[in-house]
Amino acid sequence: MKLPKEGDFITIQSYKHDGRLHRTWRDTMVLKTTENALIGVNDHTLVTESDGRRWVTREPAIVYFHKKYWFNIIAMIRDNGVSYYCNLASPYLMDAEALKYIDYDLDVKVFADGEKRLLDVDEYEMHKQEMHYSPNLDFILKENVKLLVDWINKEKGPFSKAYVSIWYKRYLELKNR
């Protein structure tokens, strides 16, 4: 499959481990693709939940997906600074329909002041039992939480101020041409 190119719009689909569609984002603008990663932006993007509810994202957000890491990262650009929402999730795959991944409930939120919180641990434990996550999957996800926190602490990749600034600037250039 041909990779989307800068300025293309794609759909993102999040699934649960049992194969159910969880959430869909329409019209994410692609900023960069490589063999293993995709960087995009959501700005007033339509989101549809599995129960049919719809909402629109409030602020611009740089999104980062990778084919080798078990997480994706959303850098939300707000008036009080950049906040991050990080989903523990399968590496993504891309087909003609959408960018797709499996959401594994655990999330790490980083507030603009640097405070970090691990979210949805109870939901993860419940789904781990209900959907029979293997011990190996559980290990991979917990190791990737550690890796993610290390990236946050070291301001690596999407967690660097320069990264957000560069990609947001590029988005504005593409949006305004």
UniProtKB/Swiss-Prot annotation:
Entries under Pfam families matching the protein: DUF402 (PF04167)
Keyword Phosphoprotein appears in the UniProt entry: no
Any GO molecular function: ribonucleoside triphosphate phosphatase activity
Named cofactor requirement(s): Mg(2+)
PANTHER family for the chain: PTHR39159, UPF0374 PROTEIN YGAC
Family: Belongs to the Ntdp family.
Protein name per UniProt: Nucleoside triphosphate/diphosphate phosphatase
UniProt source species: Streptococcus equi subsp. zooepidemicus (strain MGCS10565)
